[in-house]
Amino acid sequence: MLLSLILPTYNVEAYLGKCIESCLNQDLPKSEYEIIVEIDGSPDHSINIAKRYQENNDNIKIITRENGGLSAARNTGLKAANGEYVWFVDSDDSITENCLKAIYEEMTQYNLDALWLKWCNMNKFHNIIPLYDCTLCKEDDEIHEGLDFMCSVMGIYYFAWSFVFKRNFLIDNGFLFKEGLFYEDTEFAYRVLPAAKRIKLFCKVCYTYNIRQGSIAQTISSKKSFSDKKRARGC
């Protein structure tokens, strides 16, 4: 198994179908990658949507669990994954058509622990908004160590879905997402990336982030979230 796409799913029935379809519209044989849809105690009809796609696609695996939050869902998905590489995909977003083969080839050609992916944003009117021009992407073949990568690309945001990881790199080092924490992506990145020996920028848009109300990123506004943000950055 080459790749595992891990889709934590909670209350996203309006978006899940599009996300799964984007994961199916790929240039790898279905036998070479799996789509793990993890229903995290979702009260809507997400599980029915996932089952409908599973009927005709043997590479879709459905996991159901009591609601434990995004970090717990990602951890469960990681432990269930069989792929050599893993990609955490938010189930209200989508990935670019026919991007998996190039991602896999990049990971294997350079023997990477992590590959940073370029992405774009989509607003509620379905307009695509380029994030920014990444001047560092001119360095297509440069391999970074973890701390060097973080120092070189301080302007880059760290989201779980903006990286593809070698699964054994995460498992062997015991890297899991901390549960019950806002800004878990940032905390995860600041803890994981320094341990990576080989990281590379992949300067093709592979991911579309769906800007919407109701997501964690759009609703954080509490003292706890402020404290967690400082903690995530090591402050």
Placement of each model-derived feature along the sequence:
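Glycine-rich, basic loop-to-helix element that forms the pyrophosphate-binding segment
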Residues: 65-81, 91
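Short aromatic/hydrophobic "clamp" motif used to bind/position activated sugar donors
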Residues: 86
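Short, well-formed alpha-helical segments that are part of the catalytic scaffolds
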Residues: 12-26, 49
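Cell-envelope/extracellular polymer assembly enzymes that use nucleotide-activated donors
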Residues: 2-4, 9, 22, 34, ...
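Donor-binding/catalytic cores of nucleotide-activated saccharide
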Residues: 70, 91-200, 210-223
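Short, conserved active-site loop motifs that form the nucleotide-linked donor/cofactor pocket
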Residues: 33, 59-61, 112
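A conserved acidic beta->alpha catalytic loop
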Residues: 22, 39-48, 66
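Catalytic core of nucleotide-sugar-dependent glycosyltransferases
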Residues: 205-212, 219-235
